[in-house]
């Protein structure tokens, strides 16, 4: 059960000028170039910063009951009343004061953490496995290009 607990943002994987993946810590990521945003458009830059802040605020909660949750911070400026209404309406779920995505099953296989993304599909006509190994070679929980470290 060494995986059970809360994992917080460590770094974001981005491509450098040589098309190699490099990992940026929160401060570096927040201040890195925005190649897909018109940086002269203040509203677009503000939207991108809002998304980046949300990313660096994310957590992974691995529970002892075999469920794993991706947690996102509540949006800035949202009142408790608005949060309560959204929860009551079933629009969002809360866990540890954060918005929780759908639970994903996890299990240990040969001493390694695996979780079910729920993403099904095919690769070259073969059904792909929706289960992925969670911990990379450096010991980080990796979801897409985001690395998390256990606290």
Regions found by a protein language model. Name each.
Residues 1-36:
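Tryptophan-anchored aromatic micro-motifs
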Residues 12-17, 39-150:
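Contiguous, well-ordered beta-strand patches that form the walls/edges
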């Amino acid at each position: 059960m060494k995986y059970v607990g809360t994992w917080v943002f460590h770094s974001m994987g981005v491509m450098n000028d040589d098309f190699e993946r490099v990992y940026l810590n929160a401060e570096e990521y927040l201040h890195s170039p925005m190649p897909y945003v018109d940086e002269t458009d203040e509203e677009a830059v503000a939207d991108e910063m809002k998304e980046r802040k949300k990313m660096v605020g994310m957590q992974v909660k691995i529970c002892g009951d075999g469920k794993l949750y991706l947690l996102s911070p509540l949006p800035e400026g949202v009142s408790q009343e608005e949060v309560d209404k959204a929860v009551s309406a079933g629009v969002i779920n809360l866990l540890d004061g954060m918005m929780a995505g759908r639970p994903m099953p996890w299990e240990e296989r040969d001493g390694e953490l695996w979780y079910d993304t729920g993403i099904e599909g095919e690769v070259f006509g073969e059904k792909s496995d929706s289960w992925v190994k969670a911990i990379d070679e450096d010991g980080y929980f990796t979801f897409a290009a985001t690395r998390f470290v256990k606290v």
